[in-house]
């Protein structure tokens, strides 16, 4: 097993490069920016269809009334995401351009959205246009529009293919003319693509893409497809790479389209049988976080005999219950731990197999609503599938199955740690392995300094003016824990530090307001890209490492001392 993990680690640089790909990142960040639309629309789905579980059905008029906000939000999701994806990609492209010659992200957003409409929305006979492919069915077309638009803009801006106005013309007016040529070229190019496809195939670009990838969608929904997809989430995380950065953008179009398909099947009184959805990913495969670790902190608390493991279980049970499982991943650790390789990869796969069995064989309806990822797994299963009786049974069964899968491996690991505690010797081999893969080379030194410094944080304070700190993680979960710890300690010791949390990719507009940026381990691989942004603004940047980061989220004094050290 050790040799297998060493072999896997050799491919880590390649996978890290993929995870930093600006196009995959743009898709992911584009969806994050559009998440309010997705979650807002799901409220009306729950109101409209959850009562069905108790035999109550709204009248057609009320159902139409409730679903109108859904149609005007989720129903045109691709239109919004085309703009937000263009904006995210523009931010990435601007890192390579001089500060005095940047691409206007507002203009790329508008051009992308116009280009998308030309490729997805056919004119209606009575006026206006049809919206059949403006929702989840048009997501891939939205990505094409965004990518083409931003690249056209970059070529034009970089080579000064723009209209220059005299210096005495106001900057806002000059910007309009500067954007005119790239806007025109990108929209005309996309419209030309639409005319070519329409003339050749007789359908829009969006419809042709939907027809082309339909077999892929069907294959992905099979047992082999779900095994590869959800196994990859856990696999990448295990070797120290943020799996969602690679997998989520690749399947985003499928997951959100399937939610919409399932909803329409339910509305038609049919069986909602599409398995690959956002709910499957968040509440089935990653119930309690990647690796389906919901039950693991409880096992550490209840069956472990070693003091260390029991303490880790108690500290990580609450965040893991809400899908934030970094405390158990790095605290145990589970990642890069050969003992946990099998259950960490196998549990998510077994979970989705069981779910597919419930859907295909027992005729349970799959997910038809998008919910916040911090919703506890069992609750997310019940809510996302409209309170079906089978959903309660499924949630309980998955907890039992995951317990059975993890139990023997937790016992083996506990015996190992217990023996170390009895002998008074600690095996640092695994700790060193995690440090190497999560860039934790200086973790012990940093933490040691923090322990000394926190004895007299106020007395040794070197921060005399208000200092703003931004903590970034993958989704805004653990970054909130560290930001809260910092704010509490700063108030207690009267240190002028204010901390805020955010998700990497959604940080760029607020970045100029901060003096220090702290990267969580999940996004530490983006350090070089982030440094290009912070250096332009004169902002300090620091990345944290595995166990160090988790310790800082629990230790406000140590976290404050850590911040103070960055200004020494």
UniProtKB/Swiss-Prot annotation:
Signal peptide: none annotated. GO terms for cellular component: plasma membrane. It is a multi-pass membrane protein. Keywords: Cell membrane, Kinase, Membrane, Phosphoprotein, Phosphotransferase system, Plasmid, Sugar transport, Transferase, Transmembrane, Transmembrane helix, Transport. One of its GO terms (biological process) is phosphoenolpyruvate-dependent sugar phosphotransferase system. The EIIC type-3 domain forms the PTS system translocation channel and contains the specific substrate-binding site. The phosphoenolpyruvate-dependent sugar phosphotransferase system (sugar PTS), a major carbohydrate active transport system, catalyzes the phosphorylation of incoming sugar substrates concomitantly with their translocation across the cell membrane. The enzyme II LacEF PTS system is involved in lactose transport. This is PTS system lactose-specific EIICB component. It comes from Lactococcus lactis subsp. lactis. The gene is lacE.
